[in-house]
């Protein structure tokens, strides 16, 4: 999996593609893609970084690993491709958005509109074998995505990090720059959403911070397709 980045992430992450962990990961992925069904498609692996450049990143919403069902994953955390049923966690995200802003719940889970406005939808692991959650955990992606977080941490311009659930909150140790903002709650999963995700108002908190910085707020409304 060579460096296919086309924006300002390319020079920042180029050294990672030469490191031993990444070369090992790349060999593993070449084998996996040739012998199993793996998501997302190879050309979509780095979509989070392609849609949201380093300089344009305002918000990071950290996910875990990609959806492992057919036609779901396309390289953005929580997002699914058009024409696919909205997964339960994303549906709860939409319910919270409806409660905050009054937006109708859309008929799709395609979050590219957020990514294009500076919301980096980053999973900590970027690939998965079909039907096997966490099957690519511990293969090297964590080193790579930790570096993405570290690079954003080095920025002077503030970033708002959204850490939902224990897995995302484990990355808080990488966010040491006091310029940045962290918004935490339990995960929007149906297992935990009622224990503190619903009512946490993350979207309006983000926009309040952006407005106070003089930045354009995020238009969170996802249109019907």
Swiss-Prot record:
CDD domains: UDG-F1-like. It is an enzyme of class 3 (hydrolase). SMART domains: UDG, UreE_C. InterPro entries: UDG_fam1, Ura-DNA_Glyclase_AS, Uracil-DNA_glycosylase-like, Uracil-DNA_glycosylase-like_sf. The active site is at 65 (proton acceptor). GO terms for biological process: base-excision repair, AP site formation via deaminated base removal. It is found in: Cytoplasm. Belongs to the uracil-DNA glycosylase (UDG) superfamily. UNG family. This is Uracil-DNA glycosylase. The gene is ung.
């Amino acid at each position: 999996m060579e460096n296919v980045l086309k924006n300002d992430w390319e020079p920042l992450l180029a050294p990672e593609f030469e490191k031993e962990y990444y070369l090992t990961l790349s060999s593993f992925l070449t084998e996996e893609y040739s012998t199993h069904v793996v998501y997302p498609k190879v050309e979509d692996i780095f979509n989070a970084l392609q849609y949201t450049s380093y300089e344009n990143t305002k918000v990071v919403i950290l996910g875990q690993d990609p959806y492992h069902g057919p036609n779901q994953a396309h390289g953005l955390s929580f997002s699914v491709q058009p024409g696919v049923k909205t997964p339960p966690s994303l549906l709860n995200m939409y319910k919270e958005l409806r409660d905050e802003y009054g937006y109708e719940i859309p008929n799709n889970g395609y979050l590219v509109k957020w990514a294009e406005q500076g919301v980096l939808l980053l999973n900590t692991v970027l690939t998965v074998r079909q039907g096997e959650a966490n099957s690519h955990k511990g293969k090297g992606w964590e080193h790579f995505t930790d570096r993405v977080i570290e690079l954003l941490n080095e920025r002077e311009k503030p970033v708002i990090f959204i850490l939902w659930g224990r897995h995302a909150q484990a990355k808080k140790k990488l966010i040491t720059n006091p310029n940045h903002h962290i918004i935490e709650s339990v995960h929007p999963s149906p297992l935990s959403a009622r224990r503190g995700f619903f009512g946490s108002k993350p979207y309006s908190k983000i926009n309040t911070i952006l407005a106070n910085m003089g930045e354009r707020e995020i238009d969170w409304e996802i249109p019907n397709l």
